[in-house]
Amino acid sequence: MDDRYDPQVIEAKWQQEWAARQLDRTDTDPQKPKFYALSMFPYPSGNLHMGHVRNYTITDVIARCRRMQGYRVLHPMGWDAFGLPAENAAIERGIHPRVWTQQNIGQMRQELQRLGLSYDWEREVTTCHPDYYRWTQWLFLEFFEAGLAYQKEAAVNWDPVDQTVLANEQVDSEGRSWRSGALVERRLLKQWFLKITAYAEELLNDLEQLTGWPERVKLMQANWIGQSRGAYLEFPIVGSDEKIGVFTTRPDTVYGVTYVVLAPEHPLTLKVTTSRRRKTVEAFIASVQQESELERTAGDRPKRGVATGGKALNPFTGEEIPIWIANYVLYEYGTGAVMGVPAHDERDFQFAKAHRLPIRQVIIPPDGKASTRLRAAYTEPGKLINSGQFDGMDSTAAKVAITEYATAQGWGREHVQYRLRDWLISRQRYWGVPIPIIHCPQCGPVPVPRSELPVLLPEEVEFTGRGPSPLAKLAAWRDVPCPKCGGPAQRETDTMDTFIDSSWYYFRYADARNSEAPFDPAAIKDWLPVDQYVGGIEHAILHLLYSRFFTKVLRDRQLVHVSEPFQRLLTQGMVQGRTYKNPRTGKYVIPSRIADLNQPTDPDTGEALEVVYEKMSKSKYNGVAPGDVIQQYGADTARMFILFKAPPEKDLEWDDADVEGQFRFLNRVWRLVQTFKAKGGRLGQPLPATLTKAEKDLRRAIHTAIKEISEDIEGDYQLNTAVAELMKLSNALSSADCYTSGVYSEGIQTLLTLLAPFAPHISEELWHQLGGTDSIHRQPWPKADPTALVADEITLVIQVMGKTRGAIQVPATASQAELEEAAQHSEIGQRYLAGKTIKKIIVVPGKLVNFVLESSR
């Protein structure tokens, strides 16, 4: 008997065998129902982390189960391969981004294969490969032709020393460049946008269709889209034909407007500024350009502003009111202007107080009076005062009435506004998809002809981290003839946001080797939508929202038939590791430096350390390398621990002892099968014509496991309880002593079949040791036999005066009278009822009998 379970040998053997047999190749049998299981693809950083392992293992279990249940399953993997880290590597290490990325992909692909993940590698996509980004550019042109891709000026982070644009993550908490240390400036550049706001209403409304998504993700998206209903109102500029448009959710307060505020970047700002105020205004604009958007809008930051000297007319009151600019108003939000109602908005109140602006109360509490001196803004609904013909109206009715009045007068209209802004996709980087546009002085922006796609990234580039992007400096690549007029022109030197690449990759998997189109609509109709998408909650907004937007645009371009890409979404929790932190200094301590981990103290100061679980990271010294776990315990143990430790959607706390526990469990399964073989057991033995009580009990345990695990997988993927059921079944088989019985044979076969999606290698090995043909992963998923689930006997609890006194076994078919009699005449009944008068007997069928006694006097 081979008692030794050697995961390294077994796993390498079967991974090689599965690859040779192409076991994981996508089944395209049209007679089978389809199932598309997808994990969010990774950025190829070079190494897997435990968050990856958890995500991919969960999806792999789902995919393997669905195959065994008779589905044809699409379960692909690829690489979100463009991005800033590769360009940084080029600057720091002198290695080309393409080479660095390819090396990392090779390393990570090997790690994924070691986990036994059942990917169809023939459908692998890599977003930095020309075969992929050719179609990313093709899709950009679809947006351009639909009027959904356009250019406008937008602020970027500018390093004045290196003379280059910085990503947000390259700016530290003090607003300095990561490389030069210079204070970062905000500078306006002409950049490309996608008009996601054109789909804001549909993106919001269609959230209701996503019944398979977590409610919190839908709420996060709804808040990000941020629908507000109110009125658009116009304030004429005194001495000009132009007007300042504002959006407000409180048109009932318009009679209380005592000033208007423009964003410093607003095109009207300098137009309304008087000559006397110009220097002050320009200096203020320059100072605001040094502030990030977060700084400008933070609630705890002072609201700075200056008067322009210009005036606007409040058409409702006929008053001239001052026009200010302020740092808290952003041009990208709404109209880039707000009306100041200090009596009824707390921010306006603080601003008016700071700058001695008039405060006029126009709403009072329903049962109150106007305050002679407001100490704070009154922001609740109430009754209108100082509001002309609308005096006395309640504010809810006044919102409607004032909006209708403004519409009739030509001063405004009812309006719905969204917090969502158009998607800025320009990146002043090399390692991204070149935007397929050529700028011609005569023709303007001209799309690159589709026959000339892809616009390839040039190989011979210099990476310095200084000056314009590498593409902008490469004249041989940049300077080209205009496709329209043939005159001298220049390529667009910005590349696309990497979120573009991940906004359509799930379509490409359905037809990954198509060289004539991004995908065949027939393939999309066959596989989409994704039936189960799995990824982290950190992608709840941007990636998922952009993917939904892309899907709707491609639908409107008649390229796909679906309106939503992902039918069900599972957001797995984080993997957390134990950290040791000095609460006084906030510094983390490396565990290997701590003498006693049970009573940890700082090796430098002797202070007691705080032990908490936090997201794994290098800086906290709490990471666990998947490769180390696989080397010590095997991939199956790593998978089982990841699945067992916590429900998929909850955070998981890494515990070496629990990893060891799963390794012991797989060893028990191994020994169980070796004992079964040694005792003469074999697969496929027929069930006995008549079952003993022990066989009935074992068969009930077998089919209970089938029922419970199937329900766990069909429902909310409670894979942790599914693993617990596997352990129960293993224990039931270990306790039974009928190795040559057909029931035991059924139990071993069921255990291995149910275990296969969770621990694929050991299941395959033991299956073949027992003479199983084909792969265990091609066996049908077992179905629970309802007759086997019915017990011959049940446990009947006996209570006296509501107190449990014990339990007995009775026939499952016993009548109420038989239950009463059995309980009364049992040893327990005789002990507690002797000499007592029974007043009443309460029977809960199948559960308990309660004897109510006459009270003794």
Curated annotation (Swiss-Prot):
Motif 'HIGH' region, which positions?
Answer: 42-52
Keyword Ligase among record annotations = yes
CDD domains on file: Anticodon_Ia_Leu_BEm (cd07958), LeuRS_core (cd00812)
Residues that span the membrane, as ranges: none
Q: Which BP terms in the Gene Ontology apply to this protein? A: leucyl-tRNA aminoacylation
Superkingdom of the source species: Bacteria
One GO CC annotation = cytosol
Which is one Pfam family of this protein? tRNA-synt_1
Coarse class of the protein's main subcellular location: cytoplasm
Q: Which residue pairs form cystines in this protein?
A: none
**UniProt short sequence motif 'KMSKS' region, positions renumbered to this chain:** 615-619
Compartments (UniProt record): Cytoplasm
What does the entry list as the binding residues for ATP? K618
Q: Give me the reactions it catalyses.
A: tRNA(Leu) + L-leucine + ATP = L-leucyl-tRNA(Leu) + AMP + diphosphate
| Enzyme class per UniProt | ligase
Q: A GO molecular function for this record?
A: leucine-tRNA ligase activity
- Cite the InterPro entries for this sequence: aa-tRNA-synth_I_CS, aa-tRNA-synth_Ia, Leu-tRNA-ligase, Leu_tRNA-synth_edit, M/V/L/I-tRNA-synth_anticd-bd, Methionyl/Leucyl_tRNA_Synth, Rossmann-like_a/b/a_fold, tRNAsynth_Ia_anticodon-bd
Q: Which family does it belong to?
A: Belongs to the class-I aminoacyl-tRNA synthetase family.
Q: Return the protein name.
A: Leucine--tRNA ligase
* Gene name of the record: leuS
